[in-house]
Amino acid sequence: MSGQRVDVKVVMLGKEYVGKTSLVERYVHDRFLVGPYQNTIGAAFVAKVMSVGDRTVTLGIWDTAGSERYEAMSRIYYRGAKAAIVCYDLTDSSSFERAKFWVKELRSLEEGCQIYLCGTKSDLLEEDRRRRRVDFHDVQDYADNIKAQLFETSSKTGQSVDELFQKVAEDYVSVAAFQVMTEDKGVDLGQKPNPYFYSCCHH
């Protein structure tokens, strides 16, 4: 794979108002939009080119609608996704329950999709810790259980946003290289652990 271009389909999932679009805006355009909230209808697509070692990686990011009325439509966009960033609002416990729904959906329909749990709006906790409604340790236990990775982010300050997307790209490149290596050796991938599946936390 040395020097090759790599394309990765990434889907953003989560309840409306959790800040999926803000997360993408911060990562792709390095900006935080302040103004009236606008619902994403269907999905918005944006691409970001980056480097991982000697490889050029293009993240094709699908920002899906969070409203339940667009739920069926969202399924169209995560078909074939290699990574899913499932977002929840750290100040809204119901958004974490909704995130669990999307994880179940992905596990049943896209088994090969690596999941990243993303707690949003961490800047609000810096202002007032009492606003936290989703316990960090509970989410970490859940992440460990589903073999996902956990990040707590802020689109306003940029906290852990670049790190999240960089990890998505690095993990995919590692898995792709692993698959090429094992295929070259004639190894049955079904007997090998997927190196995607480990958990870590970033504050």
UniProtKB/Swiss-Prot annotation:
Main location: cytoplasm
Membrane topology qualifier: Lipid-anchor
Induction statement: By extensive retinoic acid treatment, in Ntera-2 teratoma cell line induced to differentiate into postmitotic neurons (NTN2) (at protein level).
Keyword check for Transferase: no
Reactions accelerated catalytically: GTP + H2O = GDP + phosphate + H(+)
GO molecular function, one term: GTP binding
A Pfam family reported for this protein in Swiss-Prot or TrEMBL: Ras
Keywords: Autophagy, Cytoplasm, Cytoplasmic vesicle, Cytoskeleton, GTP-binding, Hydrolase, Lipoprotein, Magnesium, Membrane, Metal-binding, Nucleotide-binding, Phosphoprotein, Prenylation, Protein transport, Transport
Binding sites annotated in the UniProt record for Mg(2+): 21, 40, 63
SUPFAM superfamilies membership: P-loop containing nucleoside triphosphate hydrolases
Modified residues (Phosphotyrosine): 17, 172
Lipid-binding residues (covalent, S-geranylgeranyl cysteine): 200-201
Domain of life: Eukaryota
Compartment annotation: Cytoplasm, Cytosol; Membrane; Cytoplasmic vesicle, Autophagosome membrane; Cytoplasm, Perinuclear region
PROSITE patterns named in the record: RAB
Record-listed GTP binding positions: 19-21, 40, 66, 121, 123, 156
CDD domains found in the cross-reference section: Rab24
Cofactor: Mg(2+)
Region Switch I: start-end pairs: 30-45
Entry EC no(s): 3.6.5.2
Assembly, per entry: Interacts with ZFYVE20. Does not interact with the GDP dissociation inhibitors ARHGDIA and ARHGDIB.
Protein name: Ras-related protein Rab-24
Organism expressing this protein natively: Homo sapiens
